[in-house]
């Protein structure tokens, strides 16, 4: 029997983990960069990836001086590149099996 641990963070914990203000998190949520469950900021719960995504978003916003819309697009494209690289590696492994035969 296996058990799954689901970690959810409230607004205060996310702000502490990502070292950002609540206003910053609200801005990030408004642009769809992170998507909490819950209707209001007081009720929001974030998954365990939210601190990492939030930190990346803030870094892009500050260091590259991107608007939040640009940050959302950049993060989406970076995720797509990572997914394509993973898929490419998997296909290379499969191809390698056929070539070795």
UniProtKB/Swiss-Prot annotation:
Gene3D superfamilies: 1.10.1660.10. Signal peptide: none annotated. It comes from the Bacteria. InterPro entries: CbpM (IPR022835). Belongs to the CbpM family. Interacts with CbpA and inhibits both the DnaJ-like co-chaperone activity and the DNA binding activity of CbpA. Together with CbpA, modulates the activity of the DnaK chaperone system. Does not inhibit the co-chaperone activity of DnaJ. This is Chaperone modulatory protein CbpM. The lineage of its organism: Bacteria, Pseudomonadati, Pseudomonadota, Gammaproteobacteria, Pseudomonadales.
């Amino acid at each position: 029997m296996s058990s799954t641990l689901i970690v959810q963070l409230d607004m205060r914990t996310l702000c502490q983990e990502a070292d950002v203000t609540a206003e910053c998190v609200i801005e990030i949520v408004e642009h769809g960069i992170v998507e909490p469950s819950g209707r209001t900021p007081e009720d929001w719960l974030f998954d365990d990836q939210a601190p990492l995504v939030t930190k990346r978003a803030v870094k892009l916003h500050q260091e590259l001086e991107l608007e939040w819309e640009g940050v959302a697009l950049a993060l989406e494209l970076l995720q797509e590149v990572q997914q394509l690289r993973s898929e490419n590696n998997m296909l290379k492994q499969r191809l390698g099996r056929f070539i070795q035969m």
